[in-house]
Amino acid sequence: MFGYSMVQMVRANAHKLDWPLRETVLQLYKPFKWTPCFLHKFFETKLQNRKKMSVIIEFEEGCHETGFQMAGEVLQKEKRSKLKSRFNKINCCSAEVTPSALHSLLSECSNIRKVYLNREVKALLDTATEASHAKEVVRNGQTLTGKGVTVAVVDTGIYPHPDLEGRIIGFADMVNQKTEPYDDNGHGTHCAGDVASSGASSSGQYRGPAPEANLIGVKVLNKQGSGTLADIIEGVEWCIQYNEDNPDEPIDIMSMSLGGDALRYDHEQEDPLVRAVEEAWSAGIVVCVAAGNSGPDSQTIASPGVSEKVITVGALDDNNTASSDDDTVASFSSRGPTVYGKEKPDILAPGVNIISLRSPNSYIDKLQKSSRVGSQYFTMSGTSMATPICAGIAALILQQNPDLTPDEVKELLKNGTDKWKDEDPNIYGAGAVNAENSVPGQ
């Protein structure tokens, strides 16, 4: 197999190709491992020009403009290959390439630092308000509701549910490029309700911790609840750009109930998705990310939850009671340490049998009819549900003090938790989120 030129290229450029991309290219050649040498050229020519891969290209620091231009010129000469989206914040772009085009890029573009396979990312789906002590948080005689705070739900979209009436103030669609809010999967709508449902359709019974917060739907996952690294990065960069364009009414919080397997790079910042969320954090956006649903094994924290900066949220099973006495960590909730040996998750929030908003006729709504609660609500479990609940409590903190930095919000959330004495922080994090204890003041 080593006689094939592309296999030799992979070996020579292993430091510039991430592991999934190396494996993808090599897998193309496995069926031809025992092919006679005189047929190698024939089969390789077919492979090089017919197979197509979606990739993310990272350029050397300070070379984004030049690198993007050079890559575009190379791909113009290649069949079935093209540049797609630019990610200026993280010095990358996405592209579709054949093996032949990949070879040309690595040979002719000296500004390329690394090329990543554009891997799949999925929605992390496997009483909540009361259990997190967010039913009524009063400061200075005012009940905090998240009013004036904007949360971007980076997910499958948001259905304009009656419990969100008048508060979906923006929508961006990286999947189908639609302009009006919708959710063909249902996961994003449930998460939006976990943040900010008013409970209007249930006389307040099923309301989120921030029932007056504004929402922006950023659709990065498709009808089946999956997307790609490029889709997610594009959504995150859209949020950063939104704030640059709207400095007086910015996105304060991003809730991301999604993730993919965390690969072991030299350090977590080599992960393009980690770099994207850390750019958002540095731009002043509080980022809440799901830990993942691959527990109870250790080292199962998903990406981008492996980022040291962001708030990584695990799932608590509150056993459908407001008391914390019977709370346990959900068996499915991913555990640390991360693949980089860092402690995670940061915090736990309710994530089992959470009742929130239903998106009628969506993919999940049709698939799990037994999970419907009346005509307006739906039950789901997962760190996907815990994450927006934590984001909703962060909204209360920012309503009380809008000038706090993301680091300060994270510290308040961790310091305000209900703690388990002498428990492993790689399972329990800092403890269970507690709105009453986390919001400063009396």
UniProtKB/Swiss-Prot annotation:
Effect of loss of the gene: Cells lacking this gene show normal growth and sporulation.
The keyword Hydrolase appears for this protein: yes
Source taxonomy: Bacteria, Bacillati, Bacillota, Bacilli, Bacillales
Family membership noted in the UniProt record: Belongs to the peptidase S8 family.
Cell compartment(s), UniProt: Cytoplasm
Protein's job: Displays serine protease activity. Seems to have a broad substrate specificity.
Protein name per its UniProtKB record: Serine protease AprX
Pfam families: Peptidase_S8
EC number: 3.4.21.-
Region annotation Disordered: where it falls in the sequence: 318-337, 423-442
Gene Ontology molecular function: serine-type endopeptidase activity
GO cellular component: cytoplasm
Stated induction or repression of this protein's expression: Is expressed during the late stationary phase of growth. Is down-regulated by SinR.
Alphabetized SUPFAM superfamilies for the sequence: Subtilisin-like
Main location: cytoplasm
GO biological process, alphabetically ordered: proteolysis
UniProt KW keywords: Cytoplasm, Hydrolase, Protease, Serine protease
Regulation (activators, inhibitors): Is completely inhibited by phenylmethanesulphonylfluoride (PMSF) in vitro.
Residues at the catalytic site: 155, 187, 384
Residue ranges constituting the Peptidase S8 domain according to the UniProt record: 122-439
Organism the protein comes from: Bacillus subtilis (strain 168)
